[in-house]
Amino acid sequence: METTQHEVETQSEQGQPGAEAEKPTDWKRVVLDILETLVLAVVLYFGINAISVRVRVDGYSMTPTLQNGEYILVNKLAYKMGEPQRGDIVVFVFPIDPHEDLIKRVIGLPGEKVSVHDGKVMINDVPLDEPYIAAAPLYNGDWVVPDGQLFVLGDNRNESKDSHQWLYLPMENVVGKAVLIYWPPPEWQVINHTKEVYAGQ
């Protein structure tokens, strides 16, 4: 085998027929490279779709954090090993209409009392510091979040269809956690999920 390889290489260098015989091999390599690239692209496509979903923001209920028309990447595995935390921005199946997906911020966790009074949101009577909202809420109310459910609000408090209207979000309805704004390109950024901060801290 070594002798044959040496002969082919020598013939190629000398411009013998072996040089022409090398062309099909080059084409095979090109085709093989293309096939490998296509296979890798398909694997990556299905792999990414298995762990994430891409959604379009439709409306203004999450301004100023998210803008109408932006596209975001949602991590579907975020809550397989844990549960949503206060401040997380989540995409979920609307409990009232299973054909509709919504995106809101988690405010109340199971067992907590959520109160909205005088433009402030409070958890167990302790006000939250919310620098991300568009304006203080104009509505008032008190809610106690049941086990296995969440209380979610839009950052644009007075223009949002959320838990202050239709009550609680079952955890099983959560699709995933919003992690990245990827379109349009000038708005590309990792979504910053506000840590739990109480007013006065």
Predicted feature residues:
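Extended hydrophobic leader/signal-anchor segments used for secretion and membrane insertion
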Residues: 1-201
